[in-house]
Amino acid sequence: MAKVLVMAQVQDGMQWETSLRTHGDVFKTYGLLGPVQFAVSGNEVALCFETADAQAFLKTMNEPQTVEAMKVDGVKRETVKVYVLDKSVF
């Protein structure tokens, strides 16, 4: 099990959130273990995914359906940062 944090800039935060909520079919292909948590601050977004296989999840980030969903959502792909949360304090 792994948590993955994805951060990016979008063209319009409100439009991005509305569009994101329509991608249930895409998210089902990610092998997620729970709901997608996210935050929006202006034109910056952050999403947290819990997945069974971080490497498989990372591959899905470049699949055509994900790239197209990001395009529709107004994600500025050049700003996307992905972090696998693999360390803890406690």
Language model: regions and residue ranges:
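Short S/T/G/P-rich N-terminal loop/turn motif that feeds into the first structured element of a domain
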Residues: M1-F90
